[in-house]
Amino acid sequence: MYKTLAALLLLAASTLPAQLQPRRPVVRASGEATVSARPDQVKVSVGVTTQARTAQEAAEQNATITSQVLEALRGLVGQNGELRTTNYSINPMYASTPPTRTITGYQANNTIEVTINNTSLAGRAIDVATTAGATNVVGLRFSLRDPQPVRLQALRQATMQAKTNAEAIATGLGMKVGTVLVAQEGGQVIPFTDMRLAAAGAGASTPIEVGDVDVRASVSIEAELTN
């Protein structure tokens, strides 16, 4: 009879709803890591702005200069780059004298982005574009053609840091880290670039000082605590 009663008690305990069963203590911790790498790709954006009395004249002038800029950039990058138009617009220009707004002409804007798989050509790309007629430099961005290896390295380091933090918490409680129950990436890995324009000498190519691309990762874990 006693054996039967004990078996029934064990069976009843095993069939209790999860919320009624004793909860095991857990520890939650997170870790972050940053891995630096030299960029191997640069995107240079340049703009061509033209103004004329009519929209057609502004567009035609812009098309002529933009064609010259594209031809010059193709000659520089060859098969080692890619060109595309990222923005194009034609807008009226108004006289600033109140009270009426009179159209005085039209302005056409064309933005070209060149992707180059050789970061040392960034300065030359700016020089070539402006010499061919580009009126402004819109932006300069360095990146990695294949960020995956650096991303995985950052994730591994962030995971190790999360585990180290969990062990420190457990030690402070006089316990140990047991089985890891959950491991989750804590957000997007964000590569960004430290880039500065250096001082230029007379007749020199536009100097670009390139910093490393930093890839950041964060990971959070939840693990059991054991005695």
Describe the function of each predicted region.
Residues 2-227:
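Short, charge-dense linear interaction motifs
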